[in-house]
Amino acid sequence: MALKERVGTVVSDKMDKTVVVAVENRFPHPIYQKTVSRTTRYKAHDENNSVRVGDRVRITETRPLSRHKRWAVAEVLSHSPKAEEAKK
């Protein structure tokens, strides 16, 4: 079985080695056909604490790492402008 992947935005990085990633899912409503967006929040493992709030990341499914954590950050697609300014 292939591992699932999601792309989302980091909304919290306050935990040690864990980030919260918000993934937006858009789909047409079954009856009214209006596009509906649902946001799901995943806790993902970040081994080096390198990801900051606002970063766009790709997460992949892993074995259960804790009670709520079943995803890991695979790669950082883009850094947020605020995170880049904080480094300087």
Curated annotation (Swiss-Prot):
SUPFAM superfamilies: Nucleic acid-binding proteins. Keywords: Ribonucleoprotein, Ribosomal protein, RNA-binding, rRNA-binding. Transmembrane segments: none annotated. CDD domains: Ribosomal_uS17 (cd00364). It comes from the Bacteria. The keyword Ribosomal protein applies. InterPro entries: NA-bd_OB-fold, Ribosomal_uS17, Ribosomal_uS17_bact/chlr, Ribosomal_uS17_CS. Pfam families: Ribosomal_S17. GO terms for cellular component: cytosolic small ribosomal subunit. GO terms for molecular function: rRNA binding; structural constituent of ribosome. GO terms for biological process: translation. One of the primary rRNA binding proteins, it binds specifically to the 5'-end of 16S ribosomal RNA. Part of the 30S ribosomal subunit. HAMAP family: Ribosomal_uS17_B. Belongs to the universal ribosomal protein uS17 family. This is Small ribosomal subunit protein uS17. It comes from Synechococcus sp. (strain WH7803).
